Swiss-Prot record:
Glycans are attached at residues 171, 247, 281, 302, 323, 348, 356, 376, 409, 412, 444, 558, 610, 624. Envelope glycoprotein that forms spikes at the surface of virion envelope. Essential for the initial attachment to heparan sulfate moieties of the host cell surface proteoglycans. Involved in fusion of viral and cellular membranes leading to virus entry into the host cell. Following initial binding to its host receptors, membrane fusion is mediated by the fusion machinery composed at least of gB and the heterodimer gH/gL. May be involved in the fusion between the virion envelope and the outer nuclear membrane during virion egress. It is a single-pass type I membrane protein. GO terms for cellular component: host cell endosome membrane; host cell Golgi membrane; host cell plasma membrane; membrane; viral envelope; virion membrane. Homotrimer; disulfide-linked. Binds to heparan sulfate proteoglycans. Interacts with gH/gL heterodimer. This is Envelope glycoprotein B. Residues 412-450, 830-874 are annotated as: Disordered.
Amino acid sequence: MGVGGGPRVVLCLWCVAALLCQGVAQEVVAETTTPFATHRPEVVAEENPANPFLPFRVCGASPTGGEIFRFPLEESCPNTEDKDHIEGIALIYKTNIVPYVFNVRKYRKIMTSTTIYKGWSEDAITNQHTRSYAVPLYEVQMMDHYYQCFSAVQVNEGGHVNTYYDRDGWNETAFLKPADGLTSSITRYQSQPEVYATPRNLLWSYTTRTTVNCEVTEMSARSMKPFEFFVTSVGDTIEMSPFLKENGTEPEKILKRPHSIQLLKNYAVTKYGVGLGQADNATRFFAIFGDYSLSWKATTENSSYCDLILWKGFSNAIQTQHNSSLHFIANDITASFSTPLEEEANFNETFKCIWNNTQEEIQKKLKEVEKTHRPNGTAKVYKTTGNLYIVWQPLIQIDLLDTHAKLYNLTNATASPTSTPTTSPRRRRRDTSSVSGGGNNGDNSTKEESVAASQVQFAYDNLRKSINRVLGELSRAWCREQYRASLMWYELSKINPTSVMSAIYGRPVSAKLIGDVVSVSDCISVDQKSVFVHKNMKVPGKEDLCYTRPVVGFKFINGSELFAGQLGPRNEIVLSTSQVEVCQHSCEHYFQAGNQMYKYKDYYYVSTLNLTDIPTLHTMITLNLSLVENIDFKVIELYSKTEKRLSNVFDIETMFREYNYYTQNLNGLRKDLDDSIDHGRDSFIQTLGDIMQDLGTIGKVVVNVASGVFSLFGSIVSGVISFFKNPFGGMLLIVLIIAGVVVVYLFMTRSRSIYSAPIRMLYPGVERAAQEPGAHPVSEDQIRNILMGMHQFQQRQRAEEEARREEEVKGKRTLFEVIRDSATSVLRRRRGGGGYQRLQRDGSDDEGDYEPLRRQDGGYDDVDVEAGTADTGV
């Protein structure tokens, strides 16, 4: 409150100042002959603008006309009590972002058709294509029960029924065996791991081979709410719900209907290597699609999937109620959860899948605090601003229960006190349309919400609690201190009201106690440059009388008359010189004037000191406050990395790893359509094909005939080879080889015998005949003549036979002979005949025809005896 005097107060002060200072000025003028000069103090208010007592001023209180005040002696301190806190168990449930994961079995038959070219040194695959076909139910049962299948597949393609046999053989039972894999979530069983790519043995021919492989894939599938489709681990998307319709035989939703779908009850799927008797019977869906079949366990949505999942549970949580919200905190996490005051209606009906789990978790948490706390009412459910659900079970301390029971003489120590609020089993019904994140809304928009708001809320709650605690203590201490200060000022005002009121107002004022109130008026500032202090403190004309404070001279602002007074405390000028005392010996005095301190010894000025050279006595009491404790924020994972990885129905990592591993480990030859062109393996066939194409229809006929012949011989050779591959044919081949070896050995032995003794081999009994009596062998000359005669006889018979055959063939000349004779005649005519003419045969023997050419020595002219030809010069 500002204090200001009226015009009358100012006028009175001026009059009083003029009357008092007029006589003093005359005395000051009379003292100008004193040997001690005066000292003019320095007043620089700008050096310390925070100190309002530096300027020289004149203060005087008027008994009337000033402002009057009184001190308040009755004060009430404000109430700083905090909000109500309730202990309890808190279970926090979050939205389940992990899709529904279940096991499926995929069945298919893979037909691979491979065309191989048989080259001279290398073989080449010129074409290869693979098709996948669905497996019917009767064969799927063989796969699920016994891990067997048929090695053939019969399909209807373009209106034609085609049958493919594995290894181009016949239909037989094949056994499934585990295949190599990379990921543990996918297991394959197959019947034929190798591609049939063996060419025929006929060179420069093409062969088509067929491979049929039965494959069963055990893997997982995923479906996300609203469960309109699901995706397998290998990337197949099935546009239907995986769940069974309530009281139905089909899935809940079917966006694209398969070729057929059946519900199989009490269907057993055995494990590999385990008998059918140990399989568990279950209800399964079986669907046939375009190129594969699929089966999975049929369950309802309510029994298999839940929209909420437990995140964290706390047995020592605190609930704080504010004006429009509830705050839940726990020491285990640095987060505070804010919820409306209203409870969630029909939570146990909306989320039946977790309600039983909620009761079990509450019982587990109760066991942790059963020695100190008891339940206080039933569980309540609240929904946070981050789409989390808090199941709250209030607790009460056992000591409070016992005290309350003794107070009201209750026999049951576990009864809840009537003053403690309990929860009624009946909850207020709310509009279910306002409840977001329900289990049957069909929307999957309730996903992960950032928990940063919860952490900020926790930090704010901790800061608010700490600050409110400090402010509460300060408020109470401040209130008590102010009350005590009022009492102290009231008592001090009776002694020196001016000092008390100046301290209270924070600026120089003049005060006077008039009864039970204090009259306050302002001070008047003087001309600061006109103020000077006397160095002599003795009263003139009186040797034993001295001033208690130095005498000063000053002028009022805009005034020319000089006034005298005494230097008061804190630069105040007293408008009188009546403050005197009996002079004392060996005394010192220090007085502050302006910004300096004057030292007087024996009432005479000695020196000037700076205010900073004199130490100060601190009477301030330091307020010791406990600062707000540090809070280290920790990242709270609402959803773990595993949950985030599983939140997508497409497991891209597993799909690509499995696909790459499966394609890179196929046992067989790779597809290579341009192999023959790039490497020149069948250039001859290509050239021959171009020639036949140029021939047109004739070329096609030749190619067809040649292809038929080659195919016939190829089939014969392949049949022979296939026969030898058969066990019976192989045994027969081994027997024939052994028989041939024996025959060759016998023939070689007989040949050596004939070479060593030909007569004995021809006539085995010749040796016995030579031993008979009367047998005499002929001479060697006779034997030689006989052999020569036999040789000539044999040669003559052979010559006669050849002559007879020539006579028979003479009139039957072939086309080749006619062409040869014609060509020979043309050549002879072009060369002029060479002077030769054909010899005529007159029926004589061969020797007679050439008799004129015989020489005297028995030879023939121009005849090469060894070669048997004549040099005719042609």
